[in-house]
């Protein structure tokens, strides 16, 4: 290696380790770098082999102050990869299919194998089918196995067939919380005892949660993650780093959720897509690691690549609290201090060089929620009722629903669970304590328990139409809620544990009670969900719930009792059985109350007990049987696991490159089209093309499961692409998964229209607005359009991960020039488009688009690096990896 001269010994306790001493570069620029850039530099120095990583890459990172302005390209080799099952199943399917392709090309299929640690946590499969009783957990877990046995069998095969692949069984918790509490190393002990910082990329956009503990991590597309597993560095543009200074302390009634919603809005307003955000300032010292992890978790919602908190003394305290031993914590602290990556936030003079900075006084943060349709639309809690009421009749937008004024006061009497109640606009029909964003944070979980305790003591109850659920991100939460005596109070008002997984946060909210569903449908009610999740895009949480508010766990409990978001939070919230009027101060715990419970009941032994046997899984998991073979025995009759067609007919030669000629527009879309719109994860509509496919193979609607669970079958996923019932397509006469097949003038299901174009040999393109592909890091949001025949997307801007996924599938991302979009260019989507793709294409090149109406405009080709161009010329990143590995 080029920098072996920097290797030094480091004695820690009874052990002597090695490490790359970056101070040995004797370069003053090193000390000025943000800590996150130091992590990139250390990885480049350690991996510098003059092949994957060059000396000039090291210089580019060292010269970050200048190179950040020049779109300079660098490689990065993370220490490990993390997956969840919705993205993990298709990743393992791809790896299995790649083994077949390599064998068919006459090479050793064992070449397809992860070269770095890969952890896959099964957390996306469990749904809230049962709730509000003590049997809910066991019943939901039983149904999860019944629905997903074939998927789980496949994953268990993968853990045996591939080296370096750890499967964490279902029922263990949520991937990012398990990563934070157990999987993360903080500092790795590598080959020959070399120490280096932990870093990770994951196939879930909220991988960034780990940044809160000083581990550098972010989400990538599943396709890119597979390349990393096989030894390929990530190619990235060296990022700008926004320094976010925090000062002061949070006030007594404010939660970490309120803080993260404030930060999310501030950073989204600033515009940080493709940038690193690094937190500093004396205020950081007052935040627990759980608070920091909550802020880092919602990094995708504010659009940055990472939201990073360097390691400090509170990180060491957290590692101790979560059961890591003294050798571990000493190794972390002494190594990071040796390389200048350990921070003292109480030192006001600590101010690295940043691209730009912004500042927040924690004392200015007020109780907040975000919604009703986007996570960065923060609303002060005091204004929620007014904001919702106004949005009912305002023109349809991200904040409004477009009801007629005469329909805004509708109400209907329903009977549910033997109780009668009025259901109106704003009625809270889902109240969920869910998501790693908040269930990883003891302060807000204990606060939720304290609200429940006070409610029970006051004789209050949840409204009969509210579906309540508690889905902790790990078993540790259950331990401290039990130890504190708060769990029985949560159970008393219906917040029984429904499962250990993502559940409501990702749309696995399960069905509403029938009387509630009937009332909503018959009266076109705009009902609400209040959840402690991180996303609330249209159609994500539940197809019948149009207004969804992200809130802290105690607010989820409180609104289940109030029953409506259209209620003044500063007024009377409820009335006790003896007639006492209850206001917020009567039921809301102070930060001091919460801190006392946390100090007493969150213990290291709970973490050690929970994680001691986490890899064993349940009896059902242990009894799963799978073949111990290197090549997967595909079952043609399976509707869950199918060999993908991406490598069919592949040879060692590069495919020929062709222009896009006379393409039709499959969809003409607006702004903020999410990966949920493109490739939904939730339930499969009984009238959809995917449902027709399943029914044709003898699957009953009861067993359709979800699109997320079906991601191992490309036939279903191609049919589920753009199947979101809230999709707004300017080529269609109504909202939903339909489009205009331009040649015939017919409105068809999007999949059916795409098939017509494919059968006729006509390429398809997509027109879109700003932030195309925002949301989850869903590789099927690129794979699906590829299978539908989409050759290019022309958008005003792309979310980072989705742009990478498109390139990984050989779809070209084109970007309108500044100030232009489909409307300004007079495009309706009914035209045909021809786009020449030159053989000597360069990153960021301007390309002519010829329109059938005679006009010509130029777009920016959003291949940002030469490596991305190489992937495209190979037909995709996985095809590139196969050719590289068999050489």
Swiss-Prot record:
Substrate binds at residues 84, 204-206, 535, 540, 697, 777-778. InterPro entries: AcnA_IRP_Swivel, Acnase/IPM_dHydase_lsu_aba_1/3, Acoase/IPM_deHydtase_lsu_aba, Aconitase/3IPM_dehydase_swvl, Aconitase/IRP2, Aconitase_4Fe-4S_BS, Aconitase_4Fe-4S_dom, AconitaseA/IPMdHydase_ssu_swvl. It is found in: Cytoplasm, Cytosol. The keyword Acetylation does not apply. It catalyses: citrate = D-threo-isocitrate. SUPFAM superfamilies: Aconitase iron-sulfur domain (SSF53732), LeuD/IlvD-like (SSF52016). GO terms for cellular component: cytosol. Binds 1 [4Fe-4S] cluster per subunit. It is an enzyme of class 4 (lyase). Its cofactor is [4Fe-4S] cluster. One of its GO terms (molecular function) is aconitate hydratase activity. [4Fe-4S] cluster binds at residues 436, 502, 505. It holds the Pfam family Aconitase_C. Belongs to the aconitase/IPM isomerase family. Catalyzes the isomerization of citrate to isocitrate via cis-aconitate. Has probably no RNA-binding activity. Interacts with gex-3. NCBIfam families: aconitase_1, PRK09277.1, PRK12881.1. This is Cytoplasmic aconitate hydratase. The gene is aco-1.
